[in-house]
Amino acid sequence: GFFANLTEKLMPSVVNISTTQTVIPRSNPFPNFQFPPGSPFEDMFKEFGTPQERQSSALGSGFIINEKGIVVTNNHVIEGAEDIVVQVNGEKKFKAKVIGADTLSDIAILQIETKEKFTPVKFGDSDKARIGDWVIAIGNPFGFGGTVTSGIISARNRSIGLSRYEDYIQTDASINSGNSGGPLFDMNGDVIGINTDILGRSGTVGLGFSMP
């Protein structure tokens, strides 16, 4: 069918993004507290009261916009990341680096670190997208890469308070945690939005938002 053919064409251009960063917890909140000399609790307090570095990971989505592996995603997906790995079409994994980021618009540009050629998608004219138009979202919700959902544009010019940029497309296509940074396609297979967030953290409630 039409949706299956369009999805098959677009899937190689959508990437899963995973990031890791080192998190250092707050230091001991009672730095001047001391146990009596020889107390059996002294060593235990030192062991458990000292902050321990740990690795934190996050998931997101993105899409390729040229054959050399330039990827567009949300800035909050990669912000603070020390290592970024992108998986293309659910198969090969590559390292990537940030080559541009803007916190105001919450957009980041990545470069996949390889000489391989990729299949890009192109941007459409989001200004022409109308309420009621069919759309497709492809992304990595909850780590389930290559997930495709569809719906319609429910509203335009929405404000959701995530950033100073307030002109979101609202859609009822399911968008969950991990979809952030992924593309919203029109029926021509052009990107008309970057899926950003959902209203409510427990899962999709029919209110997905996309930055045009």
Short names for language-model regions:
Residues 1-212:
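Serine-dependent protease modules
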